[in-house]
């Protein structure tokens, strides 16, 4: 017979799943909120390969978890395997937040919300007509959705595998999204109001041209806003270069913090706040001295 306390603990568990997953700060965020709001629960990391992911999803439906967050490389597969996808997840074509209702697995995507809320915190009223987006994975999908919601008229998309970028443009509509080769990103930067890196690579070292690094911030207009969804390190080489050219930058930590809000509310019934105390706790865990 299962002990009642143990059963309650099991049913209050949430996860963050990805591969690799050791870098994720999501469990730290969840644990901070659980303690702050006086809630019972547990957040765990689950490192699951692509091959094992469908079995992991099947285990969720057995009631082992309330739900959880999904990170790379599983967001599109999580969307596919969910029993029900809300309108946001369907529009994006990927899911990062899962929860159980009855015996059904439900999915949404909070990355677009997290991206916009992060910029709202640091650059209130941010807007523009033209954006450059590097990458064509799950994060790029959410950011394109967010930019379209903010009425950006042109989104220039760059990805090392051009076919993936072409597929993304087809999904969201080629009237707004234009795909270009990496080497043309510098010229397109002249038009950009917003430049977003969604890749996990060190872009400065990824692709060298004869005349230097593949992206040259010298050609970016001085009013452009530059952001990176990567948050480890907090100031990525991409952001370092932008700062060196006097451009306004926003790091990716806030996107991580804000995207965690909707899921936590669904699992535990409390809508948490992204506070200075939370940010400081995660920065301390990262070994950063910034406030």
Curated annotation (Swiss-Prot):
GO terms for cellular component: cytosol. One of its GO terms (molecular function) is shikimate 3-dehydrogenase (NADP+) activity. It catalyses: shikimate + NADP(+) = 3-dehydroshikimate + NADPH + H(+). InterPro entries: Aminoacid_DH-like_N_sf, NAD(P)-bd_dom_sf, SDH_C, Shikimate_DH, Shikimate_DH-bd_N, Shikimate_DH_fam, Shikm_DH/Glu-tRNA_Rdtase. One of its GO terms (biological process) is amino acid biosynthetic process. The keyword Kinase does not apply. NADP(+) binds at residues 135-139, 229, 252. Shikimate binds at residues 24-26, 71, 96, 111, 231. Its EC number is 1.1.1.25. It is an enzyme of class 1 (oxidoreductase). Keywords: Amino-acid biosynthesis, Aromatic amino acid biosynthesis, NADP, Oxidoreductase. The active site is at residue 75. Pathway: Metabolic intermediate biosynthesis; chorismate biosynthesis; chorismate from D-erythrose 4-phosphate and phosphoenolpyruvate: step 4/7. Involved in the biosynthesis of the chorismate, which leads to the biosynthesis of aromatic amino acids. Catalyzes the reversible NADPH linked reduction of 3-dehydroshikimate (DHSA) to yield shikimate (SA). Homodimer. Belongs to the shikimate dehydrogenase family. This is Shikimate dehydrogenase (NADP(+)). It comes from Bartonella bacilliformis (strain ATCC 35685 / KC583 / Herrer 020/F12,63). The lineage of its organism: Bacteria, Pseudomonadati, Pseudomonadota, Alphaproteobacteria, Hyphomicrobiales. The gene is aroE.
């Amino acid at each position: 017979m299962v002990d009642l306390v143990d059963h309650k603990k099991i049913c209050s568990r949430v996860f963050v799943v990805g591969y690799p997953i050791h870098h994720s700060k999501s469990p730290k965020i969840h644990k901070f909120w659980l303690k702050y709001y006086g809630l019972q629960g547990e957040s765990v990391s689950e490192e699951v390969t692509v091959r094992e992911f469908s079995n992991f999803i099947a285990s969720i439906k057995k009631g082992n978890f309330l739900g959880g967050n999904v990170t790379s490389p599983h967001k599109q597969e999580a969307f596919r395997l969910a029993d029900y996808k809300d309108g946001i997840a369907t529009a994006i074509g990927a899911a990062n937040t899962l929860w159980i209702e009855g015996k059904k697995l439900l999915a949404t995507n909070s990355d677009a919300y997290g991206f916009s809320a992060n910029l709202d915190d640091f650059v209130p009223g941010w807007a523009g007509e033209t954006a450059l987006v590097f990458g064509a994975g799950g994060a790029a999908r959410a950011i394109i959705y967010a930019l379209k919601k903010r009425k950006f008229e042109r989104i220039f998309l760059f990805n090392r595998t051009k076919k993936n970028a072409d597929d993304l443009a087809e999904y969201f509509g080629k009237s707004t999204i234009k795909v270009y080769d990496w080497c043309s990103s510098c010229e397109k930067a002249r038009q950009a109001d917003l430049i977003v890196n969604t890749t996990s690579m060190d872009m400065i070292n990824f692709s060298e041209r004869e005349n230097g690094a593949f992206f040259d911030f010298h050609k970016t207009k001085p009013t452009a806003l530059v952001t990176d969804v990567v948050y480890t390190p907090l100031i990525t080489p991409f952001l370092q270069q932008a700062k060196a050219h006097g451009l306004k930058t926003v790091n990716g930590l806030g996107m991580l913090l804000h995207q965690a809000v909707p899921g936590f509310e669904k699992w535990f019934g409390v809508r948490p706040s992204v506070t200075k105390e939370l940010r400081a706790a995660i920065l301390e865990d990262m070994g950063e001295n910034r406030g």
